[in-house]
Amino acid sequence: MKRFAMILLGCLLAGTSVQAGEPGVKQTIAYVQKLQAASGGFRSHEPKPDAVKILPTLRATSAAVRALKYLGGDVPNQAACVKFVESCWNAEAGAFSDEPKGKPDVFATAVGLMAVTELNLPTEKYAKAALKYLSDNAESFEDIRIAAAGLERLKAKSPQNDRWQGEVKKLQSLDGIFGKELGQARATGGGVVTMLRLGAKYDDSAPILKVLKAGQRQNGGWGKADSETASDLDTTYRVMRCFMMLKARPDNVEGLRSFVAKCRNEDGGYGIAPGQLSSVGGTYFAAIITHWLK
């Protein structure tokens, strides 16, 4: 059954477009929709009958809403989803938390802004305070990376923009490359995308594209520095986002399609890597990568 599903998906991905009514895509939409809880938020994955209860989070909700967009599906209970997102906003801190009444943080604030814009909510309630919070609190590369992505959705520029660029540049070589050896493609993809979002220009993208293309592994995807062969959808997403922003494509597109198909499970969802349990994050990565490959 799993082999049939992978073959079917491979056929769908090879086409010029993916329609929500196609069987494989329809099943994936249903998988994401079933993750919505009564509170309106989405869970990160389906709980097993005998497992500990899985609570919805803002991070999972933001990923689910964006996945459904690229799959051509709808949020089943959009009004409840909006209320859940709003309940994660901490007006005093000017930031989002991952759960209602939780502790605000940079990542939750950035993905919260993505959910706000994806659900077509008025941004005025959040924009000014969230901009200040992200500007004051984003310090590490990962913080700056996700903060830049969230502010991009607001079309806003942080007063810390130049400082952020300076911090990211510390990780970059003269030819625009980030990282070393097996981790170079992932690091370069994430680093270059962050710099582009912060307003940097790359007059010569050839060295960057060379690293990205060389990093594609035998199974068609991209992976972390801890393995020569393993790939995952998170790393593959970072690299493909860079390709898209540089208006380029990998050399082995069919290999990439095959890798994405291997991450698909019988429930219609996608794991972060082949053989892993389906999750909303893995399904979002698969949906947007597939969209880029049209």
Language model features with spans:
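Acidic carboxylate motifs that coordinate Ca2+ or other divalent cations, activating on Asp/Glu
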Residues: 39, 175, 219, 267
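Sec/Tat signal peptide C-region and signal peptidase I cleavage site
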Residues: 16-20
